[in-house]
């Protein structure tokens, strides 16, 4: 099975700049794998200090760009993992999340984590089919 790294402007370069040893998007075997995405502003490469709803929207907007760059779409996402720093954000994250996935959402895991080296509250990864 061939593995192809997909470069996504505004996302991949942020991870490289931070020295994080991962690929933002990998296409292999008919699937697209999107690494956990923090709420990065694709134009500035910075993680802004905004509320959890705005962070979730930024993460899912970036995810949309990533799956499209790999030849898929959000309606072809089959699995997501949502990482959150405070379980109290569950409803706020879900309010935004459901707007991206509609009536047929993918399988999902919701994980409460401690924190990250940078100041943000939500990160989401996904697997999509091509």
Please state what every model-predicted region is.
Residues 1-61, 65-78, 84-130:
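N-terminal presequence-like segments and the immediate start of the first folded domain
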């Amino acid at each position: 099975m061939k593995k192809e790294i997909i470069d996504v402007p505004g996302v991949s370069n942020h991870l490289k700049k931070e020295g994080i040893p991962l690929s933002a998007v990998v296409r292999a075997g008919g699937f697209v794998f999107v690494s956990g995405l923090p709420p990065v502003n694709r134009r500035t490469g910075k993680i802004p200090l905004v509320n959890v709803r705005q962070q979730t929207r930024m993460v899912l907007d970036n995810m949309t760009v990533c799956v499209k760059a790999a030849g898929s779409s959000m309606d072809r996402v089959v699995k997501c993992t949502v990482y959150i720093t405070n379980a109290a954000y569950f409803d706020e994250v879900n309010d935004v999340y459901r707007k991206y996935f509609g009536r047929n959402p993918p399988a999902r895991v919701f994980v409460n984590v401690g924190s990250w080296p940078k100041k943000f509250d939500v990160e989401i990864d996904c697997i999509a089919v091509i």
